[in-house]
Amino acid sequence: MPNEQLRRMDAFTFPSYSIDLATGEALFDYALTGPDGEQRFTEVITLPLPAEPPSDATVATLGRVLELLHVVAGVSYYKAAAPRRLVLPAPLGEAAAALVTAVYTKGLAEYAYRNQLPHVLELTPEIPAGSVPPAREYDNSDLRPLSAVGGGKDSIVSLEALRRAGLDPVPFSVNPNHVIVAVNEASGLAPLAARRRIDPVLFDLNAAGARNGHIPVTAINSLIAVATAVLNRLGPVVMSNERSASDPNLVWNGHEINHQWSKGVEAEGLLRAALAEHAGLTEPYFSLLRSLSELHIARLFAQIDRYDDVVTSCNAAFKLRDASERWCRDCPKCRFVFLAMAPFMPRERVVHIFGGDLLADETQIPGYRELLGVDGHKPFECVGEVEESVVALSLLAEQDQWRDAPVVRALVDAVPETAWSAAATSDVFTPGGPHHIPPPYAKALAQ
């Protein structure tokens, strides 16, 4: 479909969804419609199957979760044209409607900013009138947790905390790559995985110049995880999103633009409320690390060494052809994670993990200046707060093994006195801020 036809699309709809419980394959249909006709899409999500057939109660609850997933996953296709009308397929309660509205506005805020589409930030879904049958309560709070694994330090810290606390976690991922497979193998735990197949038509449209950009993928993967947990009679989905995920990158047209919005505490609260209201789940989903800073998590990771040869937090590495290359060593994530780990490890260990020494590489100085708030705004990446970077630098400047590293010397001279003053009184190692961690799980981090 030519781009000019896409630009004339005036509505996005959700024709149908279905699931085959014999295979775990769910089909989600979407349509962009306009004066020139429609563009249809079908997404395929395959859930891992349980050993025993699910009960009627499980199937009913799963159906309610999939109704939310159908609407939320549509964000991938909506963005190809960003029409002004978002027409939902069925009535929703207040909490579910709030989630959907936020996913398509706040979740697409970076996309709207980069594509200069302010109307996306004001989008109001059209929800059919009618009542929603009340959900039957589904108590999963005492079942084994499904712990999302992304291959990075955060999910490893959560997985090991749950294991130490005797909570017997099940590792989970969507479309696991070689990094995640290696982390699962290092854990020694039996994982579950779901498969998500985006309609290839979308890639064809993107290649032809359709609108594209960042989506709230964590919201989609979180609902896939909840669906997997319900189908497999598992307990809460445990994520590893930290408190800096709630920190916006910038403000545009009066709206906060946050690359990590769907990892933030607001999105977590909206998703929990929607799942409780629409699916009856008593304890659906939370982030175990929500009250911790990235720097605090890095300190906890330093106490675990079984994953040194497999861990990566680098998004670019997932795209590298050489499976042995786990870090690109030239992106905001690599810079930040190296900076966060370095104060808590021998230099040889962190250099071994990364396959190189970023603080000896002077070409990294401009990127580090952004992380430290000296130049530009916080990068559109999943990185910690500026204050955390300054605190990490202050710790390195006090250590014999790091203080003379070329990048450390250059950055110490670049950081303004006001930032040093803030770092001196920082609370980055004090847990705090809003969270949704249930009391039995809060103890896991204190083990």
UniProtKB/Swiss-Prot annotation:
The record, for InterPro entries, names: MurL (IPR043689)
- GO molecular-function term, one example from the UniProt record: racemase and epimerase activity, acting on amino acids and derivatives
What are the BP-aspect GO terms? Answer: cell division; cell wall organization; peptidoglycan biosynthetic process; regulation of cell shape
Query: Which EC numbers characterise this protein's activity in its record?
Result: 5.1.1.23
| Alphabetized UniProt keyword annotations | Cell cycle, Cell division, Cell shape, Cell wall biogenesis/degradation, Isomerase, Peptidoglycan synthesis
Keyword set includes DNA repair: no
The UniProt entry's GO CC annotations, sorted and at most eight, read: cytoplasm
Keyword Cell division listed? The answer is: yes
Cite the annotated pathway.
Cell wall biogenesis; peptidoglycan biosynthesis
Known catalytic reactions:
UDP-N-acetyl-alpha-D-muramoyl-L-alanyl-L-glutamate + ATP + H2O = UDP-N-acetyl-alpha-D-muramoyl-L-alanyl-D-glutamate + AMP + diphosphate + H(+)
Indicate the family of this protein.
Belongs to the MurL family.
Could you tell me what this protein does? Cell wall formation. Catalyzes epimerization of the terminal L-glutamate in UDP-N-acetyl-alpha-D-muramoyl-L-alanyl-L-glutamate.
Q: What is this protein called?
A: UDP-N-acetyl-alpha-D-muramoyl-L-alanyl-L-glutamate epimerase
The organism named in the record is Micromonospora sp. (strain ATCC 39149 / NRRL 15099 / SCC 1413)
Give me the gene this protein comes from: murL
